Amino acid sequence: MVFSSIIFLWVLLPCILLLYYVSPKPFKNGILTVFSLFFYAWGEPRYVVLMIFSVLLNYGFGRLVEKFGKKRWLLALCVTLNLLILGYFKYYNFLAEVLNPLLRGFDIALPAIQVTLPIGISFYTSQALSYVVDVYRGENQAQKNPLNMMLYISFFPQLIAGPIVKYHDIEEQIENRTVTLEGFSYGVKRFIFGLGKKVILANTFAEVVDAVYAYQAADVSQAMLWLTALLYMLQIYFDFSGYSDMAIGLGKMFGFTFIENFRLPYTATSIQDFWRKWHISLSSWFKEYVYIPLGGNRRGTARTYVNLWTVFLLTGIWHGAGWTFIFWGIYHGFFNVLERCFLGKWLKQEKFRPLAHIYAVFVVLIGWIFFRADTIGQAFSFIRYMFVPHSAVVLMERYMNRKLWMFLAAALLACGPVQWFWMKWKGRVLAQDGSVTVTSWIGYMAILWFSILLLVNNTYNPFIYFRF
């Protein structure tokens, strides 16, 4: 189930809010947990048991790690079991495809099993691992109540596509939290804002992108390929940041505060800067649980470069089982290392700032082509024909309408300038007896109304990060 569905917006969300607020405090966590399991089972009934098993497994390891102290073998066993579960469900098909041709000469073959990927397995496995590692490090005590552990892993706003919430960031909120009218109001607005980003912008761009990628790049005009690359760059941002906005807003409605997951990433002036602003919860997770344990930048220049490349290779693998994701991770690792070597010093100079921004946007845009393509070959073909003039066979005129251009202009402005102007305007209006409240609510209600109108009239409503 997705947040941007009519049944969630008009039936399930009002029901859980009503039930939560009329229930006594001792029952609130239980109600959220049961609803979260129901929410997951709605879209993934076969694998809700797998998620419950993952929760109980890591709950047990947390208790054991705390009881027996810093036993590295115990932590290693926990990490290994989690990765084996993740590896089987997410990577078995890919590994079988890659290894079976190599094993054919030895009369060995991995069984041809089409394993279905459970929704959100990368996200909830990452959270579970952060919990056990935090207990091992002594940063927090093991959770004694399995129901609270279940809520931490399965809480429906962030279960399927993040943000990835580290246990030490939310431990106190699980035990004790309050909801204020101001916080609830902010949550509603944030949810509507995210819904608009997803339904109005991301879905519109997705239809064009999917249509173009269905053809050979050689059959599509050069201008259309560039436009498609730009549209996908915007689609994935508004799709994923929209979901994060909705998750953060829902969390606020129930008294939880999640970390921000995006900070205008397309205003970045380097690839390092981009990763400080894009999918922040994942970048933070890899830094805390992979990069720093590997030694970070404390063991010399060469080791730092190896650590960086390792992290970005794993980032690519985390996103998906395929050569395109692996290449995408290596690609970003290359530019991070390049900036560490020498390029970063130039990019930081004020006189190069406009060029630095163009460089960052261009590198990210090309990278997204590999992320979106079905194969490495398709990605390179797409890029090749972006730069090689050729005659188009396929005309995409039916997508080139006023609606697309209007939404494209709005999206480009929303990636940076509009938000900057909004903060300045909001600050001035706030001084005028709070009139911003009425004005902003009118705007949010307009976004909600238009989003619902589009949902009713269009069944095309995918979420990119549900695949991970």
Show the residue positions of the predicted features.
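Substrate/cofactor-recognition hotspot
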Residues: 418
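Membrane-embedded transmembrane alpha-helical bundles that form the catalytic cores
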Residues: 1-415, 423, 427-467
